[in-house]
Structures are given as structure tokens and as C-alpha cells.
């Protein structure tokens, strides 16, 4: 049985997100929040992957840097009425329109649950890689040095109803 991911099913003003099951970055110091997002990036959701392009002084989708996962601190002001799906970093809500996302470097073995994948069906064993928009998708070309994750479990997000998958990083 496969899990079907469809952004349209999230609802109005809802966003995909990440549940960090076992991420090494907070323990080994690969947490970065120093580079602004490229001018053409308008929204970043947790679980989107960006290139940490230090040479050009920005995070983007096409640079020379390593793929890193956006994992911003959520700014939710009423936990009774809001959930993880209510948060995204939006350029038009930032001071002077400059987004500086917090990103996590990934290593093989990292495990996380997410619904931030391209629309489609995913089964245990599927391999996913970041697409041109930083969203993980199946069927992409795997070049040397590309981030590759494997679907290790078909599951739901912490709300118990939104379909999601548990991923393990195979190469970063």
C-alpha cells in the first residue's frame, strides 16, 4: 500500500512540515542560519531543501553548496488553534523582505517524518531526491553528491490523520 501526498488536501493556508525523529545536526553543530534566501524564493516550508551556497552568500536551489533541510523555529501564537501545518516562512512577512532560514545539514542515517514531498504516491523502498524547487520527489536523477533519502515507513504526521512518510538519509 502506498501513501498519497497531495498538497491540495492540506487545506487552505496549510503547509507541509517535518517531525524530527533523529536528526544529528543539533548535536554535531550543523545548524546554520547565516545566509538569506535568494530573491526569487518567496516561501520556505519546513522540510524544503536548499543549497547552502556560501560563495554567493545565499541559500538557493541551484548553487554549489550542499543540500540542507529548512527547519525553522515555528512562530505559532495560539497552540489551541494552530498546528505545525500553520507555519511557513514568507518573504513578505520578514523585515525588509529578507528571509534567513535555519537549515540543518544532513548525514546518512538521519531520520525524519514529513509530508513535504511532491504530489504522488510513495511506498517503502522508494528513493527521493530534492527537485528543482527543493521539494523531495521520486524518480529524479541521482548524481554523485546528491542528497538521497529512502522511504522507510508509510505513516501519518503527528496530527494522526495527514498522510506522511518516514525517511532515512542514505547519502548527503
Task: Name what the model sees in each region.
Residues 1-172:
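Surface-exposed, low-hydrophobicity beta-strand/loop segments enriched in small/polar/acidic residues
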Amino acid at each position: 500500500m502506498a501513501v498519497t501526498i497531495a498538497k491540495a488536501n492540506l487545506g487552505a493556508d496549510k503547509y507541509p512540515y517535518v517531525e524530527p525523529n533523529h536528526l544529528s545536526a543539533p548535536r554535531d553543530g550543523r545548524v546554520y542560519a547565516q545566509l538569506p534566501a535568494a530573491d526569487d524564493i518567496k516561501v520556505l516550508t519546513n522540510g524544503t531543501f536548499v543549497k547552502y551556497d556560501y560563495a554567493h552568500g545565499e541559500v538557493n536551489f541551484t548553487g554549489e553548496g550542499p543540500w540542507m533541510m529548512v527547519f525553522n523555529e515555528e512562530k505559532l501564537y495560539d497552540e489551541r488553534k494552530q498546528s505545525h501545518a500553520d507555519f511557513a516562512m514568507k518573504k513578505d512577512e520578514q523585515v525588509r523582505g529578507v528571509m534567513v532560514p535555519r537549515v540543518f545539514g544532513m548525514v546518512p542515517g538521519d531520520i525524519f517524518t514529513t509530508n513535504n514531498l511532491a504530489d504522488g504516491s510513495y511506498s517503502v523502498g522508494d528513493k527521493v531526491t530534492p527537485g528543482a524547487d527543493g521539494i523531495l520527489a521520486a524518480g529524479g536523477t541521482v548524481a554523485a553528491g546528491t542528497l538521497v533519502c529512502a522511504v522507510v515507513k508509510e505513516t501519518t504526521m503527528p496530527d494522526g490523520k495527514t498522510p506522511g512518510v518516514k525517511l532515512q538519509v542514505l547519502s548527503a
